[in-house]
Amino acid sequence: VLFRSKSSALYPWLKQHNLDVKDVVRKVCNSSADVYFVRQGQANPNDIVRQVKSPMGAPYIPGSTLKGVIHSAILFHFIQKEPEKYRHVWPKIKDVMNRGGKRWQCGKELDKIVKQELEKPILGRLPQRTKRFDGALQSVMKGISVSDAMMMGDKKDTLILQKYDVSAVRGESLDDHGISVFRECIPAGRKFKFSVKIDKTITKEIDLYSVDELWKWTKAFADFGVEKEKQIFGRAYTGEFQEADLADLILGGGAGFLSKTLYYALAPSQEEGQKVLAKFFDNVLFTRKNCHHHGDKDGKLTPRTLKLATTGSDRWILGLASLKEVASC
C-alpha cells in the first residue's frame, strides 16, 4: 500500500502523510546496520547487497556456501598434488578465454571444462549408473555434510560497508578508493558455530579421512590466493596480511576473484595466467568503452585489486575466516 502513491520513494510518502520515519522503520524492520564509507562526504548508498539472515533477522552463513569453498579446495588440492595430470586442462581454458564471445557463452564453456576435466575425474569416483556424469549421484561430495553456520552470542548486528578496492596499475603507485557499491557485512571478530561430518566410506575415495585434513586443504587454497595478493600489496599492507596468515578459508561474494577460481592453479606460470585472464576480462567480462583496460594496466596480477573492508579506524582484507574445533563426534 505504501508504494501506490504517485511517488515511488517511501521516505517522501511518509513525510507527506506526517508519519514519523524512524518510528515506522522500527516497527517494520527486524534489524538495522550502521553505514561506513571509505571516505567521509560521499553519496549515500543506493542498492545494498544484503547478508543472508534468518526470519528473526540473525545473520548466518549457508551450509551451501561453506560446502562450495570445500569443493573448490578439494579440486585445488589435487591440482597441486598432481600438476602434470591436470596440465592438459589449461590449454582448453586458454582457448575459450582467447577466443572470446558472449559472456554467458564463455561461462558455459568454462563450466563444462571444469566439470568434465576436473570434477568428474577428481570427485566422480562413486559407481557410475549413467553414461553422463551426474554429480548428485557420483560425487564424493555426497560424503561431506555441512550445516548452516549460525552466529553465536547476543550480538546479531551487521555493517553496511562501501566497496573498498586497492588497485595496482602498472607503473603507478597503489591507489585505494571507494566504489559506489555497498554490501551488508558481518563485523570482524564475530563467531559462528556449524557442524561438518564426513562419511569415510565415501571420502576414502579421495584419501580424506578426517575433518582436520579437510581444513588443511581449505587453508592451502586460501593461502594460495592470499600469497599472490601479498606479492603485490604486502609491503603497503603489512598488518592486514599478517592477519590473513591466520585465515583458514575465504568467504563472501565480495571477497575477490582468486578466492572463487582455479585458473592460476592450472596455468603453467603466473605470467601466462595473468596475460590470458587480462585479455578475457577486457574482451568478455568488461567490454564497455573506457572500462578497466586490464591488458594495458595490469602488472603481475589480474584482476589488479585487493578487496578491503574499513570502518574508518580499522581495516581488514575482506572475507577472511579462521576455524576452531570446539567438539568432536
Label the predicted regions:
Residues 8-54, 61-62, 71-180, 264-268, ...:
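Extended, compositionally biased
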Residues 1-3, 7, 134-329:
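Basic polyanion-binding and macromolecular-assembly surfaces
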